[in-house]
A protein has these predicted regions:
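Residue-level recognition of beta-strand microenvironments
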Residues: 58, 81, 87, 124, ...
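Proline-rich low-complexity regions
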Residues: 61-62, 102, 147
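Well-ordered alpha/beta subsegment
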Residues: 116-158
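A broadly conserved sequence feature marking short terminus-proximal activation segments
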Residues: 1-47, 152
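Glycine-rich active-site loops that engage anionic ligands at enzyme catalytic sites
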Residues: 85-121, 129
């Protein structure tokens, strides 16, 4: 906790008035149920998906049960590469904060799994359909766990 105070003017009776500022930072952890391995992976710098123990289908976003045969799934690490299927430049902040506009959002088909993700792409240029991207983990503490990573266009200069 950090407390700051500065003298400001005076009240109507001539007494000094102080502005007191209090900043409190709290860190907490909570379980996110069967998706916990995904968030633990983010802390470790890897994207995780699930694979069906019955038919072998792979899923991202991760699923506890396979959509094909309802068998339980196992967790595994993705290579962190994919292909842009659509992209746009966004000029308003996201509802959860943590990103200053403008920023780029892209639908990305991840390599090796069914499904994909709509997520932020780092860089000044909006990627074209078919552009190859690689996951990049952000060094600073994110405002939301899903902001712990973004994608970079392969071969692009930052």
């Amino acid at each position: 906790m950090r407390i700051t105070g500065t003298e400001r003017d005076a009240d109507p009776d001539g007494r000094p008035v102080y502005l007191l500022g209090v900043e409190i930072a709290q860190r907490y952890r909570h379980a996110v149920g069967s998706s916990s391995p995904f968030y633990e992976g983010l802390e470790q710098g890897v994207l995780r998906a699930t694979r069906c123990t019955g038919c072998g289908a792979s899923w991202f976003p991760p699923r506890r049960f396979c959509e094909e045969d309802l068998t339980e799934t196992d967790w595994y690490d993705l290579p962190g590469t994919g292909t842009v299927t659509a992209a746009t430049r966004v000029h308003s902040p996201p509802p959860f904060g943590g990103i200053d506009p403008p920023y780029i959002l892209a639908s990305i088909r991840l390599d090796g799994v069914r499904g994909g993700i709509t997520h932020r792409v780092i860089g000044a240029e909006t990627p074209q359909h078919g552009a190859a991207v690689t996951v990049k983990f952000i060094d600073e503490a994110p405002a939301h766990p899903l902001l712990a990573f973004a994608f970079a266009i392969e071969g692009a200069t930052p």
